Amino acid sequence: MSVVSLPQLLEAGVHFGHKASRWNPKMRPYIFTERNGIHIIDLVQTARYLNEAYEYVRDAADRGWRFLFVGTKRQAAGIIAQEARRCGSYYVNQRWLGGMLTNWATIKTRIDRLKEIEEMESSGLLDRLPKQEASRLRRELARLEKYLGGIKTMRKLPDAVIIVDQRREANAVQECIKLNIPIISLLDTNCDPDLSDIFIPSNDDAIRAIKLIVGKLADAIYEGRHGQLDTVEEDEYDYEGAMDLDDDILEDMEDEEEGEAEEG
């Protein structure tokens, strides 16, 4: 029994890595082959590592651990918010603010400010202020909500952090390492497994791949807190036929490469 089937992984495009020229050699053990210049991730290993991650997260949630989901890229942002909310976790899906964990005391004061203005809004106080002052406070509220809304109920550091795109979220990774907070991450073929405590070899650009893996980790948290979820049986599937890149996955991968080029 597995938390996900190989057909599900294939259909979501989890097996498509980056261009072979952009790989991290440390990911060699998790690569099945190269096709048309693209590394193909070994999905048998993906399924195994996902099962292990699921058990780890489920058991940790059962012990009362609190999780922070991090994914600020376009393809991941909506999924991160949706899945974190579904399982009652925290999330950062816009910009990672420097010191978000390592300078938690300062971040917490900004969260307190967010709640203060929210209370002013809900109580009707903003409507009684001069128009210019009310407008300024509402702009401040929108800005704070955008960057801190996903952690405004977080009163202390998380027990573990789930990350989509290790390279993009390098600052979050380094803060977790500095504070000895366990990192659970999707690792594409350009990532470094040494920077994660628990990892799942997976495409981290395609929306469907992110949705599947992050959704399963959210399931694990939910199960740990609330009870059993169903696992899946393996079915017969045309694995070779599913190895071809489809247009949606290619578009997501190309968008990510263009974004990295602009940042560089």
UniProtKB/Swiss-Prot annotation:
- From which residue to which does any coiled coil extend? none
Gene Ontology annotations of biological process type: translation
SUPFAM superfamilies tied to this protein: Ribosomal protein S2
Q: Which domain of life is it from?
A: Bacteria
Q: List, alphabetically, the Pfam families matched.
A: Ribosomal_S2 (PF00318)
- Where is it found, in Gene Ontology cellular component terms? cytosolic small ribosomal subunit
* Molecular function terms, GO-annotated: structural constituent of ribosome
Annotated S-S bridges? none
* Alphabetic keyword roster: Ribonucleoprotein, Ribosomal protein
Q: Which NCBIfam families match?
A: rpsB_bact (TIGR01011)
Family the entry assigns: Belongs to the universal ribosomal protein uS2 family.
| PANTHER family per record | 30S RIBOSOMAL PROTEIN S2 PROKARYOTIC AND ORGANELLAR, SMALL RIBOSOMAL SUBUNIT PROTEIN US2M
Name under which the protein is recorded: Small ribosomal subunit protein uS2
- Recall the taxonomic lineage recorded for the source organism: Bacteria, Bacillati, Cyanobacteriota, Cyanophyceae, Synechococcales
